[in-house]
Amino acid sequence: MENYDLYLPTHLIFGRGRIDELPSLLPAKGSRILLAMGGGSIRRIGLYDKLRELLSDYEVFDFSGIEPNPKISTIRRAVDLCKAQKIDYIVAAGGGSVIDAVKCIAAGAYYDGDPWDLVLDHSRIGRAIPFCAVLTLSATGSDYDNSGVISNSNLFPQVSILDPTYTFTVPANQTAAGSADIISHTFEQYLVKEGNPFTDAMCEGVLRTVFEYTPKAIAAPDDYEARAQLMMVSSFGCCGLLSIGR
């Protein structure tokens, strides 16, 4: 698969080695950046060291330990850190849980009350810290939508960097679970009372891609084409493209 860029409205930067473009996408050198992550997976695959190298001209504050289905207590701690350190930008490195958590963190940093208020009442969302998503798991489509813990047009990632090589170490069970997630998101849009020939065809293309490339990615975890195909279609599951005209 060839590298590509796509704006919808997030700037999607896809392909091997595209992570090296990160510094050109960030605010001015010296800005204060929160590096948000989950457990230890980004360290094991070398992504943490790579990001630290790319962010060497910035003041970086690590925030780790974002769990699957993030807890509001975790969000509160990150929001407090953002406020205390006057964070200018966030880099979210991980899968859907990390990226979705950062959407809430980004909004909570500009909110005077409890971030949980934003979950209960989306109309309270005002500004949000801009952020970049660096995806490590093909599943939820969080890198390309404004939803998660909360939904708001201010919560789209400005940029998402998708390098399939960072999914080579995803184990078979998580690869399969991620593919099931893509299928679920697609069927939610495909199985409606009134379809649309164009978007029906796109949904069917997503499903065919998942059915073809999931076994290949499981059989050969470092198969770049298989991982790239899954990463590509995972982004389209929640971005709204499959729902046009429905």
Residue ranges and their predicted role:
Residues 1-89:
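ATP/NTP phosphate-donor binding region
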Residues 11-12, 32-34, 61, 88-91, ...:
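Structural motif
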Residues 20, 111-197:
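A glycine/threonine-rich phosphate-anchoring loop and its flanking beta-alpha core
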Residues 67, 93-95, 122, 245-246:
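Active-site nucleophile and cofactor-binding loops and adjacent substrate-binding regions
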Residues 78-79, 98-112, 144-145:
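Short Gly/Thr/Asp-enriched flexible loops that form oxyanion-binding sites at enzyme active sites
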Residues 87-105, 136-142:
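Glycine/serine-rich anion-binding loops at beta->alpha junctions
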